[in-house]
Amino acid sequence: MSGNKDSDGGWKTFIWNSEKKELLGRTGCSWFKILLFYVIFYGCLAAVFVGTIQALLLTLSNYKPTHQDRVAPPGLSHTPCPEKAEITFNKHELETYMKYTKGMKEFLELYDETAQLDQLKYEDCGENPGGYKNRGDLESDIGVRKACRFKRSWLKDCSGLEDRTFGFKDGKPCVIVKLNRIVNFRPKPPNSNESIPEDAKAKVRPNVIPIYCTNKKEEDAGKLQEVKYFGIGDGFPLQYYPYYGKLLHPQYLQPLVAIQFTNLTMNTELRIECRIYGENIGYSEKDRYQGRFDIKITVNDS
């Protein structure tokens, strides 16, 4: 028992020694010195860290990407974009395709002419393909840049203005396609027809990035039949590039291409691939949306 009392007294004395006025073996002065040391030490570390970050930020621009040499070519996005990129519906049953047309209507609201009336934010860039629209350097001294208008009506049968079902009720579905944004990227039209499929060569024209859709599987040849393209030059016109970023180009509207499959084989799953072609457009097996996209469409008629 006496041993326990001695040990109890030992650790209690270690915690607080009333004779020496020590807490955990240190006097108040000692504790003050060591705390002061760590405050100064970690304060200096924090100052070095903050200074390094600040120096790095001074080398970066809020408007212009510093390093773009490893940026991949832009991808293609399409609407509707269901899970697994599969569009399946019955043209006689509204509820089977309403979810697709609803998403398309919401997406195209930004392209309503009434949303592009502000002369300080938007400008007309022509209804025919043109060259790049340069609006100065990627700096803030010029201020916010105007955006080219893109009229929804240019998508014609796929605009949703006359046919609010976007062709779905007739078994002729539309897909709206856009080229994803990359700051200061200038897509270059193909400079040679060698890399373009024979059937797609007719779509090559000046100042346009062409897009072409075909069957993915050889056994589906002949089942896709007629495909219509709507938009400026039936592709992506160069006057909508470059994009200056969110801060300098907040109203920017990407040019759209509407693709309508007007004569699909009914009650058959078709896998379709759409590609854009350009000198600085590449493809990747790891990214199925880089410069292209695959989609499965099944139109039921029973």
From Swiss-Prot:
Glycosylated. Expressed mainly in epithelial tissues. Residues 1-30 are cytoplasmic. Induction: By seawater acclimation in sexually maturing migratory silver eels but not in sexually immature non-migratory yellow eels. InterPro entries: Na/K_ATPase_sub_beta, Na/K_ATPase_sub_beta_sf. The keyword Mitochondrion does not apply. GO terms for molecular function: ATPase activator activity; P-type sodium:potassium-exchanging transporter activity. The keyword Calcium does not apply. Its main location: membrane. The chain crosses the membrane at residues 31-51. Gene3D superfamilies: Na, k-atpase alpha subunit. One of its GO terms (biological process) is intracellular potassium ion homeostasis. PANTHER family: SODIUM/POTASSIUM-DEPENDENT ATPASE BETA SUBUNIT (PTHR11523), SODIUM_POTASSIUM-TRANSPORTING ATPASE SUBUNIT BETA-1 (PTHR11523:SF10). NCBIfam families: Na_K_ATPase_bet (TIGR01107). The sodium/potassium-transporting ATPase is composed of a catalytic alpha subunit, an auxiliary non-catalytic beta subunit and an additional regulatory subunit. Belongs to the X(+)/potassium ATPases subunit beta family. This is Sodium/potassium-transporting ATPase subunit beta-233. It comes from Anguilla anguilla (European freshwater eel). The lineage of its organism: Eukaryota, Metazoa, Chordata, Craniata, Vertebrata.
